[in-house]
């Protein structure tokens, strides 16, 4: 009985991974993780399974509970120029300095909204 259950569990995990890779937020995850793009993971932690297990702590941990109430417009404004909300932040102005284009910012927002 254990054999079929293990096979079923493995199939479910693979299906979940395949669905994640095809989701709109997968591109945002790539930007979030890439050092030559957003590199958000250098400062922020994400829930287990949503990115690498790192212990970055310069920025806040990002998860569904922390991001509750952050709609697309608020996240877009923050990613464009976080210094407008907090002049003392060390977070780079991704939009204002053209580190990310508008489409890339939208995909990062898709990823953030998909976090558990």
What are these regions (language model features)?
Residues 38, 60, 89:
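Glycine-centered loop/turn positions within well-structured domains
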């Amino acid at each position: 009985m254990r054999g079929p259950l293990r096979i079923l569990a493995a199939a479910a995990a693979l299906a979940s991974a395949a669905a994640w890779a095809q989701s709109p937020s997968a591109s945002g995850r790539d930007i979030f993780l890439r050092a030559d793009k957003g590199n958000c993971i250098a400062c922020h932690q994400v829930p287990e399974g949503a990115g690498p297990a790192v212990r970055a702590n310069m920025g806040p941990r990002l998860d569904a509970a922390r991001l509750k109430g952050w709609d697309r417009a608020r996240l877009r404004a923050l990613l464009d120029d976080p210094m407008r909300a907090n002049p003392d932040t060390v977070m780079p102005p991704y939009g204002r300095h053209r580190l990310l284009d508008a489409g890339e910012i939208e995909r990062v927002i898709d990823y953030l909204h998909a976090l558990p």
